[in-house]
A protein has these predicted regions:
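Conserved beta-strand-loop surface patch within small alpha/beta domains used
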Residues: 1-89, 97-150
Length: 150
């Protein structure tokens, strides 16, 4: 989703099970960064699809394989044809195992402009974690409200 000053920042809705899966993936892969794809509709995340982290240094970076990305695009097309749905890959997620859920310069540079991004910060507080959603707005990656739905 690309937003401009002519539109307001969106709320992003996420299914509770998808969010639970993302948190479990982040904890399981620590101290490496985890990563995955978000499937749903614009502004609505229905499913989190874990992918392997192909970065050369997975403790500091993440890289989603193009093979994983295109496999999910094909899967969404099959679902859409079979069920008359409009599912798509709408975003990506990754973790910062020792940090806050703030996008790094690399995160911003490599981000797809039409995606929603979730970052899980496992080091956000003592014993805790924080998740933030981001979308591009006037070509800047901006935080947006993340609403958990059942």
């Amino acid at each position: 989703m690309r937003w401009s000053s002519r539109s307001r920042l969106p709320d992003v809705r996420i299914d509770r099970e998808a969010l639970t899966a993302i948190v479990a993936h982040a904890r399981r892969d620590a101290p490496n960064e985890c990563c995955g794809l978000l499937v749903g509709r614009p502004g609505e995340i229905l499913e989190a699809v874990p992918t392997s982290n192909g970065a050369t240094d997975p403790t500091r970076r993440y890289e989603i394989s193009p093979i994983d990305y295109f496999a999910q695009i094909r899967r969404c097309r099959r679902i859409n044809e079979a069920q008359s749905e409009r599912f798509a890959v709408v975003g990506a997620y990754h973790s910062h195992p020792r940090g806050d859920p703030e996008p790094s310069e690399t995160d911003v540079e490599q981000a797809f402009r039409d995606f929603v991004f979730l970052i899980v910060g496992l080091g956000a507080s003592i014993g805790g974690m924080e998740i933030r959603a981001y979308c591009f707005y006037d070509d800047r990656l901006m935080p947006v409200p993340l609403i958990v739905v059942d």
